[in-house]
Amino acid sequence: MTPAEFQALTGATSQQITDLETFIERLAEANAVMNLIGPDTLPDVWNRHIWDSTQLLALAPDARTWADLGAGAGFPGVVLAILLKGVPDAHVWLIDSLGKRCRFLQAVVDELGLPATVVNGRAEEQMIRVDVVTARAVAAMDKLLGYAQPYLQRGAQGLFLKGEKVEAELIEARNVWQFDSDLSVSRSDPRGRIVSVRSLRRVHSR
């Protein structure tokens, strides 16, 4: 996928494309000195990472506030912040426990003037009320729901980008958690799935 193809697919503005291109440049620079994404995925960054992140917006079109847990390389959180820039009351919290990743994220947020706050800390310890909590490539569903619990119990919808083994992960997670969920096929990779979660509560402790 090229920037022009992404723009035709999504209706992104020229400024949004410019911001996304700047983000990709900064990501490539940072990736040379720290492991943010697999270097072999950079040539397909527009489909593999940008479009993969963007598709979440269609699943929560009215959402204005998002929390990205384990924000790492900025997927999906930075992409969402770029696309939501200028939308009234929009804000994205980028939460990561590793300081060097947070410094990278903060530099991008500052350069692009994004409606985002970088939080260096553990996801499950933050008391933030948002419309949607999301994560990508962070943990299996049983652990991920533990990280997301404070947000889900404050009314957030969970939208989690997962791989083709997610159904087995959901079976395992139901040994620990009770929740309502729906699966959508990823629009960037038919093997991927997006898990929508609501109404989480723990059924017993491990």
Regions flagged by a language model, labelled:
Residues 54-135, 145:
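Conserved SAM/SAH cofactor-binding pocket of Class I
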Residues 91, 115-117, 157, 178-182:
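Conserved beta-strand segments of alpha/beta enzyme cores
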Residues 97, 138, 161-165:
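Short strand-turn motif at the edge of the Rossmann-like AdoMet-binding core
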Residues 31, 84, 109, 174-177:
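Conserved hydrophobic residues forming the short capping helix/wall of the S-adenosyl-L-methionine
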Residues 145-158:
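A short glycine-rich, Lys/Arg-flanked "PGG" loop and its adjoining helix->strand segment in the class I
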Residues 165-206:
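Active-site capping/gating segments
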Residues 27, 162, 197:
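Residue-level signal for inorganic ion chemistry
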Residues 1-67, 99-114:
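Class I SAM-dependent transferase core
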